[in-house]
Curated annotation (Swiss-Prot):
GO CC aspect terms: plasma membrane
Protein keywords: Antiport, Cell inner membrane, Cell membrane, Ion transport, Membrane, Potassium, Potassium transport, Transmembrane, Transmembrane helix, Transport
Protein name in UniProt: Glutathione-regulated potassium-efflux system protein KefB
Localization of this protein: Cell inner membrane
Domain RCK N-terminal as annotated: residue spans: 400-519
Upper taxonomic lineage: Bacteria, Pseudomonadati, Pseudomonadota, Gammaproteobacteria, Enterobacterales
Gene3D superfamilies: 1.20.1530.20, NAD(P)-binding Rossmann-like Domain (3.40.50.720)
Keyword Methyltransferase in record: no
Function: Pore-forming subunit of a potassium efflux system that confers protection against electrophiles. Catalyzes K(+)/H(+) antiport.
NCBIfam families: 2a37, PRK03659.1
InterPro entries registered for this protein in UniProt: Cation/H_exchanger_TM (IPR006153), K/H_exchanger (IPR004771), K_H_efflux_KefB (IPR020884), Na+/solute_symporter_sf (IPR038770), NAD(P)-bd_dom_sf (IPR036291), RCK_N (IPR003148)
Molecular function terms, GO-annotated: glutathione-regulated potassium exporter activity
UniProt subunit comment: Interacts with the regulatory subunit KefG.
Entry's transmembrane regions: 4-24, 29-49, 55-75, 87-107, 115-135, 152-172, 177-197, 207-227, 230-250, 268-288, 291-311, 324-344, 356-376
Amino acid sequence: MEGSDFLLAGVLFLFAAVAAVPLASRLGIGAVLGYLLAGIAIGPWGLGFISDVDEILHFSELGVVFLMFIIGLELNPSKLWQLRRSIFGVGAAQVLLSAALLAGLLMLTHFSWQAAVVGGIGLAMSSTAMALQLMREKGMNRSESGQLGFSVLLFQDLAVIPALALVPLLAGSADEHFDWMKIGMKVLAFVGMLIGGRYLLRPVFRFIAASGVREVFTAATLLLVLGSALFMDALGLSMALGTFIAGVLLAESEYRHELETAIDPFKGLLLGLFFISVGMSLNLGVLYTHLLWVVISVVVLVAVKIFVLYLLARLYGVRSSERMQFAGVLSQGGEFAFVLFSSASSQRLFQGDQMALLLVTVTLSMMTTPLLMKLVDKWLSRQFNGPEEEDEKPWVNDDKPQVIVVGFGRFGQVIGRLLMANKMRITVLERDISAVNLMRKYGYKVYYGDATQVDLLRSAGAEAAESIVITCNEPEDTMKLVEICQQHFPHLHILARARGRVEAHELLQAGVTQFSRETFSSALELGRKTLVTLGMHPHQAQRAQLHFRRLDMRMLRELIPMHTDTVQISRAREARRELEEIFQREMQQERRQLDGWDEFE
């Protein structure tokens, strides 16, 4: 691809993402499906703006690579050891059972047994990028089904190595393609990467961090991710697996959070590029020619994988309410199928249109997953948002709620407990199904689902409630919910959680004045206690705390129209001087000994 063509392709990708994703989100079909539809639109079978799909698809795998690096950072070797049974138990069983069933079905459709084995293995894999993205959107990351889903995906990445090695054996060209000396060298190189990463990465990053130049740290992070990906690719292994290992090796380092911050912007853009590329690869010509075959293939593929995954989840002891989430989120074909089928095609294992039909099936199965997860959400909503069962009568009054609490993590739980202790009627909205199960056992009136859906808010009693408390983890969800409440339920008093000053500014701009910055009050209280330990009188420390809170809120309001860092820094310095002057004036006015305050808790 020429330089100008590459730049044009980049502009087209950005335009497609900017145009399609907000529209898809507004239609309620999710960002992933929006990316896929955008890819179809600009690809060779749509408007035809881009024709070199294979090269872009290979480049776009970097999105998966960055995602796996961040996932590795969130784990550590001890956590992986705890997951060993689910990885090598459920993960292995899923691949083997799905591959066997799908291979048998392919043989019934006139695939040779060798092609059927390769096809079954490729179709048994799921899309790491799509599954992890949907698990995050659905709040599954911390749940039992989310942990099990991650274990299955990790085993699938590990299975890439033997699957690729199996292709030339099935093609009957093992002697021609297998050089056992080269394989031994690759194994040694892989072991060398593990040992070198274990003992060299932290000293190297310590040296780079000592320079104090943030750009160099970001460059070093990119070098690590791309370098480990290329190294694994040169060995014929999964690039995503290489960066995952690099992330795990750094998971316990002091640079973990800085690494996540440096990588996150690249991960999001490249993941979007990956989904657009998958959409571009959809061969609409094959779809038109073999429409019935493709539709049946997609339905059978998704049904077989759901059956296997649901069965394994049940055997593993996953709660019944989480099994469908687990099965649905992994029901699609995966990006690894493109690699495996290309390798098999080069070995002439497939005949005629077999490879094209398989690739179309995989691509369309990816497009079914966001829609399938919406159906699962609706099913769970009907199951958990209907009338309580007789054996699960909560002590919460069944009257219309006074307060709706959105999100019931650690922040929301404190609020909910305080309200219930004062006999307030509350309803909780939560999208983590495992949390819903737990809260119902403790007697909370809780609805499952996405609180940004107007129908869910209405069924939860938003039209009769007096207030809504928003404690979402994601600032984007908070702002979207604020907009919905202001539009559809203007009578509600909106109270919200702000992660920091940026979110506080956004809430103020949206007209929300009742909010709490999650670390501000606790930090201010600890600061007051510090003043007391340094000799300040408890009453004076309390006054200082109140003055600081008042001044900080005033400064927060004044900074709303000021968007540049320079202006904000200048105003912050001015506010600090103003705070010091206030304290000095108070000290001059209070010349008396404050004996009434000996201790303040």
